[in-house]
Every structure is written in C-alpha cells, then in structure tokens.
C-alpha cells in the first residue's frame, strides 16, 4: 500500500467526499496526492507542514528578519553573534518576519560606488516552529489549520489527473510515468489554480 507523504495536503478519505473511488484505486489516489502536494510546495517555494526549523541568516540591517517558513507559530531562541536575545526584543509578524525595533545588525562592509555589502556573515541563528497542521495529522486537540483553498487546490489537481487517467484520454498530455507519478500537461494552468499559488507563494 502506498503511504501518504509527510507533506500530503489531503487524504483519500477526504477526496471521497467529492468523488467516489474504488478500494483498489487507493494506491493510485495516494500517489496522485503525493505528487500534487510536492508540486504545490515546489511552486510555493516553501514547506507547509508544521515542523521545527533551524536557520542561520544574513541580516540586511533593517528592522525585519525574513525566515524561510511561515506562519511562525513559536520561536525557541534567537542568537546574534553568540548572544541569545530575550523574546521581548523582537516580535513575530506575518509572512515569516521577525521584527526588531533597533534593527538586525549585519556584519560586513560596503564596497564600490553602489555600496554593495561584502564579506557579510550569517550572524543570526533562529530555531522556530512554523507551518500548518495537515489533514492527515489532525487529532482531537490539534485541528487542521491548512487553508481550505490550498487543500482544495490539491484536490482539484488530483481529480483532474484521475479523471484524465480514467477516461483514457491523452489530449494535452506530454509525458506520464506511473512509477513515480510524473507528468506534464500542454494545457495552461487554470487561472484559479495560479491565483491560489500566488496568494501563498514565497516571493522574496
């Protein structure tokens, strides 16, 4: 039996609310969910599942420190040049930003006519928890926090691919490999799908 990946954005049982599948199609549906979920994360340029991260970052000297993942749920500690900051010295903002009133100091020197920074150092270390509770990880005490439109996008991608396979049609299909569920479609990405991607994509 195919196991759902750690980053699977929906489950076969939840998909069955929208479309009926036979028991012998479970593995195919699970494979399509895994592939769609991975594709979504690739397009978003970020991870979605709740987990703990440890990062070393080069600050820009501004008041905002951009972490790679969000939403930030908890910051365990922040260290600058070997000294740990008190949690009162910064605040958690939207889109993976830690805000510090007196700025995040960078180490280096300006160079050239444009004063481009040189010899910069990743002198800030952050350990934090970020992400969403996915449908497959739900418990009585931890409900799903994944935005509905992201799960809906995954469901639509699986339904579209499943329908194409079931119909036997290959219009617009460039390539397909069932072994690892890779495919490309000649048709353009639906505007509604792209809108969801743009809403949650990491741009910086």
Short names for language-model regions:
Residues 1-204:
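Divalent metal-cofactor coordination and adjacent catalytic microenvironments
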């Amino acid at each position: 039996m195919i196991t759902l990946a750690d980053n699977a954005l929906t489950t076969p049982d939840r998909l069955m609310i929208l479309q009926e599948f036979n028991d012998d199609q479970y593995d195919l549906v699970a494979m399509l969910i895994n592939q769609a979920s991975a594709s979504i994360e690739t397009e978003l340029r970020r991870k979605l599942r709740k987990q703990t991260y440890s990062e070393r970052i080069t600050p820009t000297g501004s008041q905002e420190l951009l972490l790679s993942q969000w939403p930030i749920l908890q910051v365990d500690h922040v260290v600058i040049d070997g000294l740990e900051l008190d949690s009162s010295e910064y605040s958690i903002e939207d889109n993976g930003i830690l805000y510090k009133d007196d700025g995040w100091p960078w180490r280096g020197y300006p160079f050239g006519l444009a004063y481009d920074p040189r010899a910069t150092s990743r002198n800030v270390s952050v350990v934090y928890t970020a992400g969403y509770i996915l449908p497959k990880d739900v418990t009585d005490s931890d409900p799903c926090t994944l935005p509905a439109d992201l799960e809906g996008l995954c469901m639509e991608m699986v339904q579209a691919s499943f329908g194409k396979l079931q119909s036997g049609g290959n219009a617009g299909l460039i390539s397909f490999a069932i072994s690892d569920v890779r495919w490309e479609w000649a048709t353009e990405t639906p505007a509604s799908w792209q809108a969801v991607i743009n809403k949650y994509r990491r741009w910086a």
